[in-house]
Structures are given as structure tokens and as C-alpha cells.
């Protein structure tokens, strides 16, 4: 009986949507530098699945809809590395020249 209860109420129970595991790990907040939005959260694959990326938690991060759709998928923001602690965000991507800023977490690195 206790085993069943532990399985059902475990934070990693199979019935919990995968995205919720990512959101929970990231504190239910957008992980883009300077953003703390808790609305319209989306599960982002750091290495896109279409490019061979996995569903592993280390390849996924939480982004708000704005940073996900108008940033990453619009080609203005790039995210690379292993989640949650080793993600590098490049902001202000341009056709010529380096990105305007690079962050690891909320720490600016370039």
C-alpha cells in the first residue's frame, strides 16, 4: 500500500507531464536572463529534437512564450549548454558580428 502511495505522489510519477518536471526544476519561472515570468511557460529543447536533441532534462529549460517564440525561434536569442546550471544565453544575435550579450544564468560573461 505504501509503495503505491509513493509511486502516485512521487514528484517524478509517470503521470506527471514531462514539461512539469522541467518547470518544477526551474522554479516555475522563465530561465532567460533578467526574466522572471511565471506566465505562459513553455518547455524548450536546448538542442532541437529536429537536430537530434533528446528529451533528457539536461536538454530542456523553461522559457516564457515571448522568449521562446519571439527570441529563440525568431533567431534573436540562442541557448546552449546543459540545463539547469550550465546554460549560456546569447542575446541580440546578428548576421554580422558577435551577439550583443552573453549570459550564464544571470551573470553576464561577454
Language model regions located:
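A boundary/linker detector
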Residues: 1-110
